[in-house]
Amino acid sequence: MSRGIPARGDILELSLDPTHGREIRGSRPVLVLSADAFNKASGLLLVAPITQGGTASRENGFCVTLLGAGTKTHGIVLCDQTRTIDARARTFRRIEKAPSTIVDEALDAVRAILS
């Protein structure tokens, strides 16, 4: 159930469908990367999907592992598959808060992609 606007570092479960081509699909955990002020003002969230696979992202270094992070969510954060979602239009469930070190690593990976 969706309640309120999520914050940076929240791990949510939601459906990423519809998708096209190589975009990651289905219902899965995502990590919220956008700043709280942006989230609240727009109702939009920049999220990175979390998966157990992600071979290409692992090989290219565009992911952050949750292994050893102390989260109940397992897998890797796909920083090369970020997308904007409308938090007011999608149904989601809050799972947990990611450690700040994981969020910082994910933001660094996104910056590397954009620079």
What residue ranges belong to the model's regions?
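Conserved functional hotspots at enzyme active or ligand-binding sites that engage polyanionic ligands
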Residues: 1-115
